[in-house]
Amino acid sequence: MLIDIAVNITDKLLAKDESSVEEVIRRCKDSKVLPIFTGLDHQTSKICINLAKKYKTVSTAGIHPTSSSRYSNIDEIVPLVNDETVVAIGECGLDYDRLEFADKVSQKRIFRSQLDLGGSCYFFHSRSCHRDFMEIVSDYRIRGVVHSFTGSIEEARELIKKGLFIGINGCSVKTLEGIEIVRSLPLESLLIETDSPYCKIRRSYAGFEYVTTDFSQQKALKKKNEPCCVVQMAEVVSNATGKDYDLVVETILDNTIGLYGDVLKKSVERWGL
C-alpha cells in the first residue's frame, strides 16, 4: 500500500460535491492508497477533520502561508490541531512566490505562532524562501516534512540535516535537476504525495519517462491528479534510482508511519490495506 501525504480534498477541482469525494475515496481503495487530507485554514481544516472521521483516515490542520493575512492570531486553529484525527500542524510555512496574498511579515508571524504550539509533527510549505524558512525553524525542535519540494539539492540536504523529510510530487520531478535530486537523496528521507488535484506528472516533465502506470484511459483522471495516482511517484523513485519498487514502497511507507505515528498507523489498520 501507499500513503499520499498531501490531498487537497476541499478543492472543488478534486471533488466538487459529496458524491465526488466518494468516488475519490473509492479509487484510493481500489489502488490501495491511504489519503491524508490537507487543511489550509480554519474552514478547510474543519472540513478535512470531518471527512477524515467519515472515511477513517487522517488530516492536517493549520494556516497556509498565503492565508496568513486573514488572521491576526491562530486561536481558531488551536482546538483543531488537538483533534484525534490530526497527524500534523499545517499546511504552514512561507511562500514568497505569492506575496500578493500575504506579505512576508504576516507569513512569518503566523508561521512562528504555529511553531510555538509545540506540535509533535508539522506539514511544511516552503517556496522561494529557504533562508528565512531555515532561520525560523532553527529556533525550534521539530519533526515534519517539507512537502512539494522544488528547491536545490543543497537546500534539501540542509532540511534533512535539520531532521525533516522531503515530500515529492510531480512538480518535484518536472526537470532533469529534480530527477537528479531524487537520485541523490537517501530513500529514508523521502515521502511521496500528489498534492492533488495539482502537481500531476505531465508528459512534458522529465519524470514522466519513469512512469509505468497509465491513468489516462480513466475519464475522471484524464486531466486532474488524484491520490490514487501517487503510485506514479513511487514508480518514478524506483525507476529513476534503479531501486527495487517493493523496497521503495516499503521504505517510504515506514518513513511516513514513523513520522506521523500511531494515529496514522491505526488508520492504516482500519483501512485494511
From Swiss-Prot:
One of its GO terms (cellular component) is nucleus. GO terms for molecular function: 3'-5'-DNA exonuclease activity; metal ion binding. Its EC number is 3.1.21.-. Its main location: nucleus. InterPro entries: Metal_Hydrolase, TatD-like, TatD-type_Hydrolase. Binds 2 divalent metal cations per subunit. It is found in: Nucleus. Signal peptide: none annotated. Its cofactor is a divalent metal cation. Keywords: Hydrolase, Metal-binding, Nuclease, Nucleus. Gene3D superfamilies: Metal-dependent hydrolases. A divalent metal cation 1 binds at E91, D195. A divalent metal cation 2 binds at E91, H125, H147. Pfam families: TatD_DNase. Putative deoxyribonuclease. PANTHER family: DEOXYRIBONUCLEASE TATDN1, TATD FAMILY DEOXYRIBONUCLEASE. Belongs to the metallo-dependent hydrolases superfamily. TatD-type hydrolase family. This is Putative deoxyribonuclease TATDN1 homolog. It comes from Encephalitozoon cuniculi (strain GB-M1) (Microsporidian parasite).
